[in-house]
């Protein structure tokens, strides 16, 4: 699952990705 923002994306099983089209980051676990 993914949530917007990477400030709380600190888990080893999560990955922060940047959407180049919307210029927004998301945390995917």
Curated annotation (Swiss-Prot):
Signal peptide: none annotated. GO terms for cellular component: extracellular region. It is found in: Secreted. GO terms for molecular function: toxin activity. Keywords: Disulfide bond, Secreted, Toxin. The keyword Secreted applies. Contains 4 disulfide bonds. Expressed by the venom duct. Its main location: secreted. The cysteine framework is C-C-C-C-C-CCC. This is Augerpeptide hheTx2. It comes from Hastula hectica.
């Amino acid at each position: 699952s993914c949530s917007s923002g990477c400030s709380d994306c600190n888990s080893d099983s999560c990955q922060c990705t940047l959407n180049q089209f919307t210029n927004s980051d998301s945390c995917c676990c």
